[in-house]
């Protein structure tokens, strides 16, 4: 029999790290197949009602006429919604206001489908044709940037193959929106209205600053932000503080010799031409700088105020950007849900594809991060919370870093801790195996579930500061000469508060001879 206090376990650790991929499979409704397309009639009716309701009351753009025959349906197998509208619903001009209008329709439709499946894209047909049929120049912009990006990647891969260091190593982080000059009334306007105490263009700089800090410290790369960062200095023409101004104006001040970046609508009579130039200036400047990645920070909006959660928008047809978006969402989910109070915060399971100028003109992997909906009261409260801001931006950084390094985003999990036998008054190592990519330092918490001698085994923690890969080498010690067994329940927690589930493992202390 073991005497009390003669059997005590002491733990010390050293460490090493690994990852794998996880796939989220959406649930579907009761589906039937028509001409090779999986459909759900009831869901299509809901989508059609939603599309008709919104297009029947949404603010029309110049040249638009209400669509009398709006309908919508979803291909369950492909996860794509198709919206069919009259040709008369086309605006006179394709620009950011039209993209914003479609985003409101997208978000209303996605709110309908979210409980059942992930929709990757909402496509629109106007009189039976897609938007590029009427605005071929938009498709040409997309094709030009896509081809440039593919050429840059091929050249980079070839230089790497022969041992030449390539790339600028710069990340481009753009805070969306800000003040612009509307030439209709010659008034300086914000690109977004206030909701729940949030003006999007005044919020995004704080998120861009948070992400910049995380990228510089963790991804070890310089970051360029096109909007002015803080300070009380006033923009001369508007009288507003510089940090409140849209990126276009800071870019014009810094690059006066490159109107091809910030004055892309020179000669246009459109009242919102500087708004359009602001959208264009961000990706065009990223191209000019040769940035490795472009991340555009936004908050989201919904007409009904019902939509919630974080989303990432990528350009349709760009698989590299989609891979980056998926990695960012995966890491955002892990980091946000590890933050106090956000354990059930909604994060999209995969990116959404939508044609947006910020991504369309970019020749590098480019994503729009819609961190939360400022039109929903609880999401808005989260957006104003420094805890949420830090967690979400650490998630964006981690997702990018894993993508850059060719690693899959895998949730942190302890997979196995080997059983070990320890000599009396001695120590022995065992392996702690884990999945995922924890942020160091990490803490291992050991709690006894069963102990041969009750009270002889006590819970302990050990912190490991040096980053390494799985498996962790854990030195486990027995004090005293008595024989005993312990069943431990162990949890790993990283520096960001990401915690694994518990795993149980056994240790035997050999008695002295």
Regions found by a protein language model. Give the residues of each.
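N-proximal, solvent-exposed amphipathic alpha-helical segments enriched in charged/polar residues
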Residues: 32-78
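Active-site-adjacent mobile loop/cap segments within catalytic or ligand-binding domains
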Residues: 296-307, 313-314, 344-410
């Amino acid at each position: 029999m073991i005497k009390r206090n003669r059997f005590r376990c002491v733990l010390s650790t050293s460490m090493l790290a690994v990852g794998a991929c996880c796939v989220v499979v959406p649930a579907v409704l009761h589906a039937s197949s028509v001409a090779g397309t999986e459909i759900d009639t009831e869901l299509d009716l809901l989508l059609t009602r939603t599309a008709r309701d919104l297009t029947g009351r949404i603010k029309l753009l110049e040249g638009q006429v209400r669509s009398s025959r709006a309908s919508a349906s979803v291909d369950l197998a492909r996860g794509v919604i198709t919206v069919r509208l009259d040709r008369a619903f086309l605006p006179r001009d394709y620009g950011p206001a039209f993209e914003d209008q479609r985003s409101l329709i997208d978000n209303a439709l996605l709110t309908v489908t979210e409980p059942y499946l992930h929709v990757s894209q909402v496509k629109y047909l106007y009189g039976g044709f897609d938007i590029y049929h009427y605005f071929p120049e938009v498709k040409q912009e997309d094709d030009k940037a896509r081809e440039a990006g593919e050429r840059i990647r091929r050249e980079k891969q070839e230089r790497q193959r022969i041992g030449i260091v390539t790339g600028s190593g710069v990340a481009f982080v753009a805070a969306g929106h800000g003040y612009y000059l509307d030439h209709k009334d010659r008034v300086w306007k914000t690109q977004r209205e206030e909701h729940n105490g949030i003006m999007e263009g005044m919020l995004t700089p704080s998120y861009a600053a948070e992400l910049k800090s995380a990228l510089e410290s963790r991804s070890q790369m310089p970051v360029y932000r096109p909007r002015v960062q803080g300070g009380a200095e006033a923009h001369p023409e508007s009288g507003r503080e510089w940090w409140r101004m849209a990126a276009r104006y800071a870019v014009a001040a810094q690059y006066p010799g490159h109107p091809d970046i910030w004055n892309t609508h020179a000669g246009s009579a459109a009242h919102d031409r500087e708004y359009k130039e602001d959208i264009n200036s961000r990706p065009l400047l990223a191209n000019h700088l040769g940035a490795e990645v472009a991340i555009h920070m936004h908050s989201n909006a919904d007409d009904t105020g019902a939509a919630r959660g974080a989303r990432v928008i990528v350009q349709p047809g760009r698989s590299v950007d989609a891979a980056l978006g998926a990695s960012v969402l995966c890491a955002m989910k892990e980091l946000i849900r590890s933050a106090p109070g956000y354990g059930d915060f909604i994060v999209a399971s995969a990116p959404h594809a939508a044609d947006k100028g910020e991504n369309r003109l970019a020749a590098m992997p480019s994503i729009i991060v819609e961190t939360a909906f400022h039109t929903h009261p609880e999401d808005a409260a989260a957006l104003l919370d420094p805890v949420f801001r830090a967690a979400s931006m650490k998630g964006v950084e981690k997702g990018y870093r894993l993508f850059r390094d060719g690693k899959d985003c895998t949730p942190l999990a302890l997979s196995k801790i080997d059983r070990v036998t320890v000599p009396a008054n001695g120590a022995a190592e065992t392996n702690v195996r884990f999945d995922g990519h924890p942020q160091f330092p990490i803490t291992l918490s050991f709690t006894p579930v069963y102990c041969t001698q009750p009270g002889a085994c006590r819970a302990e923690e050990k912190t490991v500061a040096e980053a390494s890969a799985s498996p962790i080498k854990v030195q486990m010690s027995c004090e005293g000469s008595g024989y005993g067994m312990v069943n431990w329940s162990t949890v790993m927690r990283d520096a960001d508060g990401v915690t694994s589930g518990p795993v149980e493992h056994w240790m035997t202390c050999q008695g002295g001879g």
